[in-house]
Amino acid sequence: MEYDLNENTFFVKELFSPKLIKLGYYNYYILEKAGLSHKQILKRIPKDSLFCGIKDKNATTTQWFCTKQDIEEINEENLKITYKGQSNEKIWIGKHKENSFSVLIKLNSSENDKLFKLKRELVGNYFGEQRFDARVEKFYELQQKGEYEAALKYFLTAKSKFDSENSTKIKQLIKEKWGAWKEISRSEIIPEAKKELFHFLEKKENYKEAFMFVEKKSLKQMLKAIQAKRFNDTLEQLMIAKNCKGLRATKALPRKIMITPTEFEKKFGLRKMERKTFFKAKKFRLKTTNKEDEYWTHFALPTGCYATIYLKFLKESLL
């Protein structure tokens, strides 16, 4: 089984049917995007926009969002936004029941026969790789060791693919001048909102407490990703203990795993994270194309489950 996920071979659609009215508190829109990240979308719509979930960049996706504001519809090649109505209820993460997926795959004749036998199998409900920023692993390692100075420095200076030219300059300055807090805070390229952190460090070099002065949204996203990693690690240990092969799960697993936030995470508003340990695909079917050994596979997964994990399970099970 072979596949290459991109906007022409990977399609995702939220299965969500909100009850809409003519006049309500929130405006509801359908967003269709191709090859665009969630961060790219956020630059085009109001900041108060709410989603059921974040959709993959390497796909063509259809999803709902709501906002209190009126916005113009968009009809571009890789982005469409269409007004659908209003509601007094807002959208939240996980409000929809399922996501449907269509993926272009290649199968040989023996794999084709085996594939349908797998559709009823239970699959380990891991978070997919796209859930994790490349910096998560290192930051988690430093935090676990209690190396808060190194963790703070890494958080403030580690490069990201989303960095602007100005962000790159700021990170470079902080890295080069680390410890010279007064000099950093006086730099013209440091935004006023960031200077509070360096004023604090100038008076009190408590690196753990200093995290209270970093950009909260970015830190919270990082800590949530760390919680997801802890879930994956816990699930992997349970799967090994139950002699699960690869991603194939068993009902012998506890139905859910609860990840309790650390005292550090609680300071930034993180709560307990509860997630099911396995899932089963629904509505599985194959459709032939006009090319030999090429098929469209269609399936639906519960909210929060990753198609990339399911595809990986199918591929490894066919080996």
Feature map (PLM): residue ranges:
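Extended, charged/glycine-rich binding lobes that contact polyanionic ligands
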Residues: 1-302, 308-319
